[in-house]
């Protein structure tokens, strides 16, 4: 069912040029969170959202440095978009991992969440492909 909901969301949003509100459910790591999105007055779906064009360290990273930075990035994301807060999703596309979407995300203050993480050195720009290693 969740894969179907993601497919419906991606198809609907692929032609949309507007932002869609979503309620933050759970922060998974520094660049991924779950969100509840209302399709209509009676239907809300939960989706996993990955911040578009951002890479943060992995929670199960290759070295202690990466794992520590991953916790810091996750905690910072939780400060920028607290659980229960409303965010705006735009430029929504299907992610390479089924069941997840990529999107630009703005918080309640109107800040681009990915840009904040990059500016504050919790993440770096990412345009797909092979990730640069975080371990030295």
Give names to the regions the model predicted.
Residues 3-5, 13-136:
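Small beta-barrel nucleic-acid-binding modules, primarily SNase/OB-fold domains
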């Amino acid at each position: 069912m969740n894969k179907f909901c993601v497919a419906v969301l991606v198809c609907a949003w692929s032609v949309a040029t507007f932002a869609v509100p979503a309620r933050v459910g759970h922060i998974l790591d520094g660049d991924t969170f779950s969100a509840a999105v209302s399709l209509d007055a009676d239907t809300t779906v939960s989706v996993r959202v990955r911040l578009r064009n951002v890479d943060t360290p992995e929670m199960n990273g290759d070295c202690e440095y990466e794992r520590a930075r991953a916790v810091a990035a996750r905690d910072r994301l939780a400060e920028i978009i607290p659980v229960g807060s409303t965010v705006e999703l735009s430029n929504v596309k299907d992610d390479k991992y089924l069941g997840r979407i990529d999107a630009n995300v703005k918080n309640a203050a109107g800040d681009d969440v990915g840009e904040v993480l990059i500016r504050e050195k919790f993440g770096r720009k990412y345009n797909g492909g092979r990730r640069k290693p975080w371990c030295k």
